[in-house]
Amino acid sequence: MTDPSGTEAPSKVGSFLIWQQPHLIYLAELLYRANPSEELLKKYNSLIQETAEFMYSFATYEEEHDRYVLKGAIPAQETLRAAETVNPPFELSYWHFAMQVAQTWRERTGLERVPEWDVLIEKLSPLAYNDEQLYLAAETAVDTYKDIRFTSDHMAVLGAVGILPMNQLIHAGYMKNTLHWIWDNWNWDKTWGWDYPMTAMNAARMGEPEKAVSALLMDKRTNTYLVNGHNYQDGRLRIYLPGNGGLLTTVAMMCAGWDGSEGNNPGFPKDGKWNVRWEGLQPLP
């Protein structure tokens, strides 16, 4: 995390976060999907390629296991420590998605795919899970479902399929197991405003639209919106915007769908109680 001049932000957490790195690739892809043009390709391709080059360089190859890992970072679930965290799930999924998109942009602009990037995509570590077939907060967080430190803050594992599409690193059944456990047991009083939209996005992609709606309407302090639109968290934060952006994105996804979704308004229950009207929205990847 940096300021506009590139100076590192003063934070004991922000300096170790990596999950924002692929944002530029994701946002540029959304722009292109909404309005494909040579102008967009020329405007953003160099930034996408440089971002992907950093992401490739950040991943570590483990010869013993013939795989790439992500480590030395604080994940989106900020209760984990950089020095001991390996393979956080949201970051793995985001790396996989963004590197694929970067290769696609190379093809769109007449460039050859980077072979080393394809190797990374193929050999990126799958998400780690326990004996109960629940995904862990990180490969190294073996006590994920026993230690409240790992069941508080952002349930970022749900973002691995929700904010992002399903991919080869993830087993759909294990992800649904994880959603159900989190729904019933998470420390919901220690969450943030964008956790509810993220949970809803996961539920929608997992074929549970009732949970998607219920997540958006969950009665928790950090899921509160004041009359001025502020997603109130606590008295310390005078403004907090991630929840607003998450809510808008999630509702749009529940309406317009995502690549591979079926039918109209796929994120809403088909119980005859919903009459959803919308216009001008685009499906997510």
Mark where each language-model region is.
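Acidic/histidine-rich catalytic neighborhood
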Residues: E50-R108
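A non-catalytic, amphipathic alpha-helix used as a structural packing/dimerization or gating element
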Residues: K43-E50
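Active-site core of glycosidic bond-cleaving carbohydrate-active enzymes
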Residues: T2-T7, K12-A34, E38, K42, ...
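A general structural signal for short secondary-structure junctions and capping/turn motifs
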Residues: T60-Y61, F150-S152, L281-L284
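Short, glycine/acidic-rich hinge or "gate" loops at secondary-structure transitions
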Residues: L40-K43, T60-L70, L111-W117, N264
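Intrinsically disordered, low-complexity coil segments
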Residues: L80, Y232-Q233, G260-N265
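Surface beta-strand/loop "capping" patches
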Residues: N265-P285
